[in-house]
Amino acid sequence: MEARLLVLLCAFAATNADTICIGYHANNSTDTVDTVLEKNVTVTHSVNLLEDSHNGKLCKLKGIAPLQLGKCNIAGWLLGNPECDLLLTASSWSYIVETSNSENGTCYPGDFIDYEELREQLSSVSSFEKFEIFPKTSSWPNHETTKGVTAACSYAGASSFYRNLLWLTKKGSSYPKLSKSYVNNKGKEVLVLWGVHHPPTGTDQQSLYQNADAYVSVGSSKYNRRFTPEIAARPKVRDQAGRMNYYWTLLEPGDTITFEATGNLIAPWYAFALNRGSGSGIITSDAPVHDCNTKCQTPHGAINSSLPFQNIHPVTIGECPKYVRSTKLRMATGLRNIPSIQSRGLFGAIAGFIEGGWTGMIDGWYGYHHQNEQGSGYAADQKSTQNAIDGITNKVNSVIEKMNTQFTAVGKEFNNLERRIENLNKKVDDGFLDIWTYNAELLVLLENERTLDFHDSNVRNLYEKVKSQLKNNAKEIGNGCFEFYHKCDDACMESVRNGTYDYPKYSEESKLNREEIDGVKLESMGVYQILAIYSTVASSLVLLVSLGAISFWMCSNGSLQCRICI
């Protein structure tokens, strides 16, 4: 019996050998990423690609303030609605802001022809030079320029009119034919606006213009149109039964525009020499204007971010991330974060990389843990860690660079007659948005899968590197660990880590210990067989005795009748 106990003690002692394990870093990160095959994978490190925050303010764009129209809209501002006098001196802006209650547009009722196209043109204008195209005091000597006012465009309680147009009426009892031209010598496009008045009755036509069969003609090299007043009774709007239609054209440099009329002309007084700017645009927002600066503005607020995607608003001004419908776009840079339970087993062994990462290893992504007579400790493999960091950093930067095409995205303008086109445009935009969102999400899923596989591969490569050095001088015990058949001090451990392990030096000692341990295993197997047989016999005897006792008790109290027949 003493010999068998000695064999068991030898078996226990043989397992308390020097060990080295390969593992990876873990930390307390709660970052999660999605891959093609998994969702919410916790990782040690990750980068966010999706901006979802803004400051709730309208800011300067690259140092240039926006033009907030307040209660006025584009029409009221350009025509010069008296309610928009605060905007008369506005000449430059980074972007134009209308609000949800921008009601002051055309004060005298009528249609603004091609208004949506004009708004579209202004989306690329960053400033203009406002000038008198036809000076009021000298351009119309044979026509009245002061009596053309209306209660519909009142100012300070008195009848008034648009600040940038002149309502020409008859002078005395005549309205002689007028013809006035302007040559664009500004060296840039000039925006010219005018109107045509449509009285409700012939009496009004005569009292204003004298001529019953009046006309208005406007012509340039690219624009040529003749208008005749449509005299008809109409429901009153703003207490006006008449109507005014408003028109505009862009006059190219060097081109000439000519106005000819015998009545009903709302003549241009001021025009605008336009300066184009690719970063401008028109947005609708009720956010307040602040003294702040940004590179990207949305109707909800400014975005200060270098990320490639945002889910704040599809309408943007400036250098902005691409809008996607995603709620999460996080790219993994680190490893799966599965911290191991640092409990010690029978011989003080730690968990290896299969069971989880090491929070104790903080100076690298991959590395080693050793245990010998001199103690235990962690050591990162700096070379493989640095190679991985460089590779992943380059990949992340490449993805951000390729996807980070920042630009302005403003809505397109359609009038009431173009609703089918507008609906089709929305469907097309939605389709592109879905494609962008799908591509962004798929890119992140694929790259996350590749990154995590890349880390797994690096750990396996490190494991194979150690295995190829040790050969049969150590055995694999699972969990990414090797148990040496020889004593391995700190210098020996370092040689394994740096790839200079001297296999022949330890091979003889390993051979002897390996044979001794194999012998102990064979002997211990005999002990285990004896113990197993003894256990089986003992349990069988206990079962038989128990059955006999139960039967005797049941016979004695009549619960069981025993009959013996001969």
UniProtKB/Swiss-Prot annotation:
Modifications after synthesis and translation: Palmitoylated. In natural infection, inactive HA is matured into HA1 and HA2 outside the cell by one or more trypsin-like, arginine-specific endoprotease secreted by the bronchial epithelial cells. One identified protease that may be involved in this process is secreted in lungs by club cells.
Native source organism of the sequence: Influenza A virus (strain A/Brevig Mission/1/1918 H1N1)
InterPro entries associated with the record: Capsid_hemagglutn, Hemagglutn_HA1_a/b_dom_sf, Hemagglutn_influenz_A, Hemagglutn_influenz_A/B
Site (Cleavage): R344, G345
Family, as annotated: Belongs to the influenza viruses hemagglutinin family.
S-palmitoyl cysteine lipid modification positions: C555, C562, C565
Taxonomy, superkingdom: Viruses
Protein name (database record): Hemagglutinin
Ranges of the Extracellular topological domain: 18-529
Record has Transit peptide as a keyword: no
Pfam families, A to Z: Hemagglutinin
Topology within the bilayer: Single-pass type I membrane protein
Glycosylated residues, chain numbering: N27, N28, N40, N104, N304, N498
Membrane topology (Cytoplasmic): 551-566
Regions crossing the membrane: 530-550
S-S pairs: C21-C481, C59-C292, C72-C84, C107-C153, C296-C320, C488-C492
